[in-house]
Amino acid sequence: SAWMTADIYRDGYHYHLDFKKGENVGGLQKEAYKGRRTGSIIHWKPDDEVFTDIDVPGSYYKDTLRRQAVVNAGLTLNFTDEKEKDPATGKAWHESWCYEHGIADYVAEVAGQDTLTPVFSCESEAVGRDREDQPDYKVLMSAAFCFSNKVQMLEYYHNSSWLEHGGSPEHAVRTAFVYQINKYLKDKNLYKKGESTISFQDVQDCLVYVSSSFSTRTSYENQTKKAITNK
């Protein structure tokens, strides 16, 4: 950043820090604070010597904040864009997001009311390792989905980040849905003679699915961190 300021309210104190070109200016300032406020306020400006274009569109922030609200249930995130005016009020554009039940509410929002099934959600915790020579790590997993003949969507998140290219969560979803639906059709003798078994493409066409996981160790597919390889 070209410059950054940080104001932190915690444990009865107000802390303030100034930075310029990555270096602290003036040291840490600390003063007693008698209010009830807690949290952090960060102001910063991208450095145009580092970034070729610092005019980041509002749509980028909106999409990022919305996704963060989805995977952090009950958290309200607000966005005010002083460059864009609200045509109804003439004031700065303001938007907020909050999904009280996280990904389950998000799936319901995307799918709408006319769905083939209700939204199903589940959550689980586990401890495991990816290889025998690696240490154990904890993982918290949650998923929500429904079926619709009008909307199709698959999204995966890990440690609050959107996995644009999926990785192991996507592979797991493909395997699980195909296996379970195929088993059901076979057990109920619903396949016609000579009919091909179901593929994930058949499932995907009507599936609205979102998963969110958190782990204490993460293995990324590459440096873009848009896919994970955790087993």
Specify the residue positions occupied by each region the protein language model found.
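GHKL-type ATPase core
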Residues: S1-E109
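GHKL/Histidine-kinase-like ATPase module
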Residues: S59, R66-Q68, G74-K225
